[in-house]
Regions:
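Structural alpha-helical scaffold elements that stabilize or flank donor/cofactor-binding regions
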Residues: 31, 52-53, 73-76, 205-209, ...
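Short glycine-/small-residue-rich Rossmann-like dinucleotide-binding loops
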Residues: 65, 88, 211, 217-219, ...
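Phosphate-binding beta-alpha-beta segment of Rossmann-like dinucleotide-binding domains, i.e.
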Residues: 103, 108-157, 169-172
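Short beta->alpha connector loops at strand-helix junctions that form conserved
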Residues: 86-87, 104-111, 203-204, 245, ...
Length: 336
C-alpha cells in the first residue's frame, strides 16, 4: 500500500446510485489503497453548496451525474491532474475551459460497451431466426410446425451501421458465427475493416443486402435523421432492424410508416426519441416493433466492470504509464 503522505488526493464526484453501481465496495477499497480520498462522495448539489471542498483534489473519479467542468467549477480545482470517468460519453461534461487546462480524461467507454455488444449479438442471432415473429405467431395461432422463412446464422448477412467502439466489438464477436458482415462507416479504412472481417459498402447497400441491420451511430448534428424511410423500404423480406445507439439518428415517423406497410420487417429498439416514447406513439402498438427501456448498456452489477476499468487506468496514471482509454478533444466531439 502507498503511504498516505505520498498519495495523491482524490474525490468521488457523481450521483449516489451510479456511485454504488460503478464503484462497489471492492472497487472502492482498491481506490482507497491508491489515492487519499479525503472527503465523502460529492454530488452536484454538494459541490454547488461547498465548491471550496474541491480545492485539494488531484484526481476525480466520476461517472453518471458528474457536473460539467465549466470555467467556474475548474477555478475550484487548481490542483486537478486527471479525471477518471467510469461511464461512456463525456460530451456533456467537458468544455473549452477543460480542454484548455490539458487535463487528461479517461473513460469506461470500452467496458460500458461490452454489455451493449453482448445485447446486440443476442438480438442479431434471434433476429436471424425471426424469433419474435415466431413467438407472436404461435401465441396467436397455436401453429407449431409451420415456420416462417428465416435467414439463420449460416451464410446470412449482418449489416452494421458505424464501426466505432461498439460496432467493432460486435464485428469481433460475429467472427464466431458463419455469417457475412457488411458495414457502413465513412471514417474506417479498408485495412481496419479487413481486420474485423467486414466488407465496407454504402449505407443503402447495408439496408438492401443485410438480413439484420444493427445501428451503432452516435447522435451528432450531422447524423440526426441519418436513417430514413427509404432505407427501411429497401430492406429484404423478413429483415430485422436493431437500434442500441440513439433514437434521433432515425427518422422515426418515416420508420413507422414503412413498418406499418411492411409487416414482414421487425424493429428492435432499445432507444427512442424522445425517451421514453410518448404513450400514444404508434411504435408502442405496432406488432412488429419491440421496445426495451434503454437497457443494452451496463446496468447494476455490470457497472462494476466500468469501475474496475478505472482502477486499472488509475494504476497506469500513478505509474506514469499512458492511459489506455484516454479521450482526446477530437474524439470527444464524435461521441454519442
Amino acid at each position: 500500500m502507498i503511504s498516505i503522505s505520498t498519495m495523491l488526493k482524490g474525490l468521488f464526484l457523481l450521483d449516489p446510485r451510479p456511485y454504488d453501481w460503478i464503484y462497489g465496495a471492492e472497487v472502492r477499497q482498491q481506490i482507497h489503497e491508491l489515492v487519499d480520498v479525503y472527503a465523502p462522495l460529492q454530488t452536484r448539489p454538494t459541490v454547488a453548496e461547498n465548491p471550496a471542498l474541491l480545492g485539494e483534489a488531484e484526481v476525480i473519479l466520476s461517472g453518471w451525474g458528474c457536473p460539467q467542468f465549466t470555467e467556474e467549477l475548474l477555478a475550484f480545482l487548481p490542483r486537478l491532474r486527471a479525471v477518471f470517468y467510469g461511464a461512456g460519453s463525456i460530451r456533456g461534461i467537458v468544455t473549452e475551459a477543460f480542454w484548455a487546462r490539458q487535463i487528461p480524461i479517461t473513460t469506461a467507454t470500452v467496458a460500458n460497451g461490452v454489455p451493449v455488444s453482448e445485447f446486440t449479438i443476442a438480438h442479431i442471432i434471434l433476429g436471424l431466426k425471426r424469433y419474435w415473429q415466431h413467438v407472436q405467431r404461435f401465441r396467436e395461432t397455436g401453429e407449431w410446425w409451420e415456420h416462417l422463412p428465416v435467414a439463420g446464422a449460416y451464410g446470412s448477412t449482418v449489416g452494421l451501421v458505424s464501426l466505432g467502439t461498439i460496432g467493432q466489438m460486435v464485428a469481433e464477436r460475429l467472427k464466431s458465427y458463419e455469417v457475412n458482415v457488411i458495414a457502413y462507416d465513412p471514417f474506417v479504412t479498408q485495412e481496419t475493416a479487413a481486420a474485423l472481417g467486414v466488407r465496407l459498402c454504402s449505407l443503402e447497400q447495408v439496408f438492401r443486402q443485410a438480413d439484420v441491420v444493427s445501428l451503432h451511430t452516435p447522435w451528432l448534428p450531422e447524423t440526426e435523421g441519418l436513417i430514413t424511410g427509404a432505407h427501411f423500404a429497401a430492406m429484404k423480406e423478413g429483415a430485422t432492424f436493431i437500434n442500441t445507439a440513439r433514437g434521433a439518428v432515425v427518422r422515426e415517423a418515416e420508420m413507422i410508416a414503412v413498418l406499418q406497410q411492411r409487416p414482414d420487417l421487425y424493429a428492435l429498439l432499445d432507444v427512442t426519441y424522445p425517451e421514453p416514447p410518448a404513450a400514444d406513439s404508434p411504435s408502442m402498438r405496432l406488432p412488429n416493433v419491440t421496445i426495451s427501456p434503454h437497457i443494452a448498456g451496463a446496468l447494476q452489477d455490470e457497472c462494476l466492470r466500468n469501475g474496475q476499468s478505472m482502477v486499472e487506468e488509475l494504476k497506469r496514471f500513478l505509474n506514469g504509464e499512458p492511459l489506455r482509454y484516454a479521450i482526446s478533444r477530437e474524439r470527444a466531439a464524435r461521441m454519442a
